[in-house]
Amino acid sequence: MKKLFIVIAMALFSGATFAQQNVFAHKVRVGETLYSISQMYGVTVNDIKKENAGLTDNIMAGQSINVPQSPTGELHYTIQAGETLYSISKKFGVTSKVITDANPGLSATNFKSGTLIVIPRGVYSTADQRKQDIAAPKERTGCKLTHLVAKKETVYSISKLYNVTQADLIKANPVLKDSKLKKGMTLCIPYPQDERYYTPSDNEVFSEIARQKGVKYDRIKVAVILPFGLDRRTSEANKMTDLYKGFLLAVDSIKDSGANIDIYAYEEKGSDAASIQGILDNPEMKEMNLIVGPVRPEHIDAVAQFAHVNNIVNVIPTSTKVNAVNSHKTSFQVNSPQNYTNSFVYEKFLELNSGANVVFVNMSDKSDYADYLWGFKKYLESKNVSFVSMQFAAIENIAKHLKKGTRNIIIPSASSAAAFEQLVNEFNTLNLLDNFQLSLFGYPDWQTFSDNNEKMLDKYKCSYYTTFFSDEAKQRVANFNYRFRHNFKKAQIASCPKFGELGYDIGAFFVGGINNFGGGFMQNVDKVKYTSLQNPFNFVRKNNWSGFENTVVMFINYKGNDMIEIQRYE
């Protein structure tokens, strides 16, 4: 198939008192709910509703809501006009490093009035630590300017001319201790007392922080924690083994450039906390620069917390139903949370299909997308968009729900190949395209049968959303598949997504990024240049103290005439 690709706290804080911010503002992001927001800030949904008269559970992206301070968690503070990193650190009796370490997403660019940050409770910086703070006032050394001595000038007259003391002038020019002032001498004029100290700008402070963190590693140490199934081979184990194999291929490519990389593989067993803690207790774990895994939800928080405390990049490779990134600054969630993806799809679908007639068809097959479809309908209702829901059993009557002269978009409730084929076969029998503009909107699973149903996908100009897409016709994908078969004597397991490619994308992006940026990887994640085989990445912090979520969502559109359009959003 010819393919066209378009990548479109009153709180007492270490002895410092300050005006309390009892409530702070939160701007709702796509996919967030009152519950997820309450969990993020350590308060209850009712606590939030008490601060927002009339607030319902139906919140929208972009909406601003008031959130009360948690009595036990970190203090949330909104930067005020005119404040600097140093002035805030003085207010809370801590160093600027305490603040920037707690808010790794903070930068000179977003340090401005209205920005929300966290201040760790119970942290105190000594007077000596605050004096050594990179944001603290610094003494200017050297000469402010030079002066050519004229006839009849004296040390006294020159010191008065430049508002410096005679002692300071002599100190800056030791020759004056032993020699008299002479015409033609060039003197160093020191800074006056009122100009002797200066406070570094926020730009200077953040630049220095970045410089200190950006030290490259002589050797990169990586831990991979996956359920390899060493005791018992399962479908999950086979997929995770493919992921590991793809990861190793990426690492080998990076090693070819001269990088020194050590891989430590650990078997993820069971679902109890003790099994994962046994891995984390290994002395070498604290030396890791990257931890890939685990994949089981019961283990993710423990590893994320360990990585958070030890400043280790932690990749959550598969789960969409965890919230580790909310409170763990070094966590990266490869698969966007389902709420985010769903909400994004609803909004983008309506934006792209304004005015279309939408028909939901309830198929006989069981749906794995019941929550998604329920949310889809609720979203359309909230936007006053009418739609039709009908049973597949009455499909012969679908024409009465379709409209001529406008686009009709059919959304089946099931994502299987059988459901798709059943539906389009009925459409063919009814010759619907003779009288109506008709298209189907589906699911990521449609990739599993796209090769066998290419003609029908093209005929009905089908579209589906996904966060991953592998194009077998791309030379890079073909080359990867050859390397995989050549190195491991077997092809990737047929699955959706393909776990070998997922592993390669994770390895190339994270190990490659850490190799290039060292300890500054998280501050430079947006500068990592990598074109994915299957899983495109755009990692964004939810806030200044959180970890990262991958925000990429794609729409795959069959345009007819053997053309495919890929619309990438992030």
Language-model region placement:
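Bacterial Sec-dependent N-terminal signal peptides
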Residues: 1-27, 565-570
